[in-house]
Amino acid sequence: MSNTEFHPHIGVGLRLPHHDHFHHHRPALSWLEIHSENYFQPNSFHRQQLNQMAEHYQISCHGIGLSLGSVTGVNPQHLLRLKQLVDDLQPFLVSDHLSWSENGGHYFNDLLPLPYTEEALEVFCRNVLHVQDALKRPILIENPSSYLKYQHSTISEWQFLTEVQRRTDCRLLLDLNNVYVSAFNHGFDCQTYLEAIPAACVDEIHLAGFTIKSLEQGEIWIDTHSQPVSAEVWQLYQQWIAQHGSRHTLIEWDLDLPPVDVLLNEAKKAETLLRASLLHNNPMHPSLALG
């Protein structure tokens, strides 16, 4: 890898409007995260560009369409296309969400929450194991942002996610913005959630921005990925890495995309916190903070 200016754990989401910039200018990052479904067509222009960029960057494949919570199972054609992409790119991480978005062949344009019950847990774990068997690797499961919850849930989201990890040996993608947004929407404490998640199983952290929407009943916070990372989420990140150490960290920005320089400035903020934490935890070994 020739891109060594940023700490190697810091990456950004590669979105199609930024393709040309990354392809031609190669900002000095070690890795990029893609939305897997955007690259299922092997002969598309953007897939060919990605193949060339993969010679200079590590790639993480982040899915939004496996619908791992669907009782009917994972769509076999979707899984086949994902497997072909993973086999071709050999990404260093593959991830999807603790959610569902398909039922009986009908697809919803959102990542919908699960009821946190034993039945839903069995379905979700069965689907994760099926995907991991097909890909021949563990996948990362990301905690969702949510705006409603089911009255018949019997355990918390963090208990559900922890049990998924235990039963499937999957890895975890900890989205700190999602924790913060859901904590406000549902009235739980962020620290309760974060302390319950097995840190040793977290391989990646997502950082993003959110939007506040006013309703007649009050405010709702929405994980829009259209804003800079909030000060409160930066604080959660700083606290988490101080306690648990460095992880691959992604700046996620999907809507109202800014210029690439704005995205890289957010990445630089993450890097500054990460290097400071590494240096603080290893004061006699400053080289650890140099990447």
From Swiss-Prot:
Disulphide-bonded residues: none
Family annotation (HAMAP family): UPF0276 (MF_00697)
Lineage, broadest ranks: Bacteria, Pseudomonadati, Pseudomonadota, Gammaproteobacteria, Vibrionales
Domain of life: Bacteria
Record's protein name: UPF0276 protein VV3194
Family the UniProt entry places it in: Belongs to the UPF0276 family.
Pfam family, any one: MbnB_TglH_ChrH
